[in-house]
C-alpha cells in the first residue's frame, strides 16, 4: 500500500555531487526534507562549507566533502572515506556538470575535454566507486542528472548534447549491469530551469519568449520543482523503476 511514508527517506544517507548551489542544492534540500542525511560535494571548499552551514541551520544533518569528481583517485579515496567515517551511502545523485557554448567548428579541444570529463567521466568514476559499496549490501539508488538535451538539440551546444546523450545510455547501462545486483539506477532530465548556468538565457528576452512559447507549461522551471522527482526515485515508491529517464521539463520533450 502506498502512503506518505513510502516516500520518506529517514535513516538514509544521500551523496549529491555538485551540490553547493543550483540544481544540486535543490535536490539535496529536497532529499533532506524527506528525511535523508546529506553529504554535499563541490570543488570550492569555502562555498561548500557555507552551503552546508545554511542547510544545518534549517535543521538538516549535513556533511561535506570538497574534491574534484573528475579525479578518479580522489573520487575513490573520498567515497571510501564517506563509507568509513560517515556511513553507508544509500542514495547517490550524480549532478556535477558544466556547459560550454560555441559552434562545433570553433569548439576548442580543451573545452571538449573539460566538458566530457565533468559531464560524463565523473559519473562513471563516482558511480563505480559508490556502486562497489552498494553491491556488497545488495541495494542502493543512483540518480544521474541528464537533460532534455539527452534527446533534443540546439545550435552551439553540440558537445553538451553529446555528453548528455551518452549519459542517458550510461544510465541505462548501469541499470543493466547493476540491477541484477540489487541497485536501481535512473536519470532525471531537467528542461530549462532558472539557474546560474542559464542566467544569460533567462535574461535574453528573445530566447525566453521563444522558450516559454515552446514549453506547454509556458514558463521556466524553478529548481525546487526537481526535488519531487529525486525523492520519488530515491524512495520505496520506485522499487521497480530501473534504467528510466524521468523528464521534468514542462512538456518540452512532448512536442515538436
Q: Can you say where each PLM-predicted feature lies in the sequence?
A:
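Residue(s) in the substrate-gating loop at a strand-loop-helix junction
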Residues: 147
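Short C-terminal tail/terminal secondary-structure segment
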Residues: 2-6, 152, 231, 242-256
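Alpha-helical segment proximal to the catalytic Tyr-Lys
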Residues: 132, 176-180, 239
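Substrate-binding pocket helix/loop in short-chain dehydrogenase/reductase
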Residues: 103-104, 111-116, 142, 207, ...
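Active-site loop immediately N-terminal to the catalytic Tyr-X3-Lys motif
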Residues: 105, 152-158, 180-181, 218, ...
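Active-site helix of classical SDR
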Residues: 127, 163, 171
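Conserved glycine-rich cofactor-binding loop
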Residues: 13, 20-21
Amino acid at each position: 500500500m502506498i502512503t506518505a511514508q513510502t516516500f520518506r527517506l529517514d535513516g538514509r544517507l544521500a551523496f549529491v555531487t555538485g551540490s553547493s548551489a543550483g540544481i544540486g542544492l535543490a535536490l539535496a534540500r529536497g532529499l533532506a526534507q524527506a528525511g535523508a542525511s546529506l553529504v554535499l560535494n563541490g570543488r570550492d571548499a569555502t562555498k561548500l562549507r557555507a552551503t552546508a552551514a545554511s542547510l544545518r541551520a534549517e535543521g538538516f544533518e549535513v556533511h561535506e566533502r570538497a574534491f574534484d569528481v573528475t579525479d578518479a583517485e580522489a573520487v575513490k579515496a573520498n567515497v571510501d572515506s564517506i563509507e568509513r567515517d560517515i556511513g553507508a551511502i544509500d542514495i547517490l545523485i550524480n549532478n556535477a556538470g558544466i556547459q560550454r557554448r560555441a559552434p562545433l567548428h570553433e569548439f576548442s579541444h580543451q573545452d571538449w575535454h573539460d566538458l566530457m570529463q565533468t559531464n560524463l567521466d565523473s559519473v562513471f568514476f563516482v558511480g563505480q566507486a559508490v556502486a562497489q559499496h552498494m553491491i556488497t549490501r545488495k541495494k542502493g539508488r543512483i540518480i544521474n542528472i541528464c537533460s532534455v538535451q539527452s534527446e533534443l538539440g540546439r545550435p552551439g551546444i553540440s558537445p553538451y548534447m553529446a555528453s548528455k546523450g551518452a549519459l542517458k545510455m550510461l544510465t541505462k547501462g548501469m541499470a543493466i549491469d547493476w540491477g541484477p545486483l540489487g541497485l536501481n539506477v535512473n536519470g532525471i532530465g531537467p528542461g530549462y530551469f532558472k539557474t546560474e548556468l542559464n542566467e544569460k538565457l533567462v535574461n535574453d528576452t528573445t530566447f525566453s519568449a521563444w522558450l516559454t512559447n515552446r514549453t506547454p507549461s509556458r514558463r521556466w522551471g524553478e529548481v525546487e520543482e526537481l526535488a519531487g522527482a529525486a525523492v520519488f526515485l530515491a524512495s520505496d515508491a520506485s522499487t521497480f523503476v530501473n534504467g528510466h529517464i524521468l523528464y521534468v521539463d514542462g512538456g518540452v520533450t512532448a512536442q515538436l
